[in-house]
Amino acid sequence: MTPAELRATLSLASIYGLRMLGMFLILPIFAIYASTLPDKPSGFMVGLALGAYGLTQALLQLPFGMASDKYGRKPMIYLGLGIFAVGSMVAALAMNIEGVIIGRAIQGAGAVSAVVTALVADLTRDEHRTKAMATIGGTIGIAFAFSLVAGPILNEWMGVPGIFFLTGVLTLAAIAVVRFVVPDPISSHYHSDASAAPAKLMDVLKNTQLLRLNYGIFALHAAQMAMFVVVPFAINESSHLDVNQHWKIYLPVVLVSFLLMVPGIIYAEKQSKMKQVFVAAIAVMLFAQIMFAFSIHY
């Protein structure tokens, strides 16, 4: 990569990671925080608050990508990050679960993921695009792992509303990064591997292999959100740790997960066994869910 390509990749990966950090930081603590709200929300409402961003993000991903082809990548990123910041502030000021749900939905409405990947494609050559996308993907994983540890610690300092405020402020700072650090593309054009193609939507929806993968992603994220509705309470009951101390559970779990994941990825790549490793990972997740079902009594 040239220095300009590397700068573009790292700066855009940081924007992507920061946005996901704002989504993930509340996961390990929100369910317990929600139980202290005056309206005593149900598990369904808590789950909706956690996952509302995904609903609006899914709906607006294509429109944002299409708009970026017409109005430019950076203007749409500014708009998306601005919407995300507004959603963070709405959630921070919310006095009940409905307000948090609205805030989270607004956060998701700043659906800049497709725009960011399109801008990465504009700023990198074809032979380096895979590395750039992999860097962004790695940033998402790091943001999730970091959130599990940092969320409880930040909660002790500033509480959930404070975390939402912090997310909003950092998002506004990210706009400055896009403006002054991310290079301006010489031209923005369609990339078959990174840009939205509405005309091919029906072809995608009819592709059974893609549908299987899409369902797998949906199931993974649905299970992830559902787990964080109950796991914080389960940790409280089994370990008697305060929610601010839950990082003591999450940190070793994250470290062990990375240690187990890396050899699997290396083996899959070197031996061309990606599907087998993928299926094995699903089996491990299924086993873990069954264990949770018999061990969590909350």
Residue ranges and their predicted role:
Residues 1-5, 183-216:
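Juxtamembrane intracellular "pre-TM" segments in multi-pass secondary transporters
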Residues 28-43, 229-245:
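Short amphipathic helix-loop junctions that connect adjacent transmembrane helices
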Residues 54-62, 144-145, 254-262:
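Residue-level signature of mid-helix packing/kink "hotspots" within the transmembrane helices
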Residues 59-95:
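Conserved MFS/SLC helix-loop-helix module at the cytosolic interface between two early adjacent transmembrane helices
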Residues 60-71, 260-273:
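Helix-to-loop junctions at the C-terminal end of transmembrane segments
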Residues 70-80, 269-282:
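Cytoplasmic membrane-interface "Motif A"-like loop-to-helix N-cap segments
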Residues 103-141:
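Cytoplasmic helix-loop-helix junction between adjacent transmembrane helices
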Residues 169-188:
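C-terminal membrane-cytosol helix-exit motif in multi-pass small-molecule transporters
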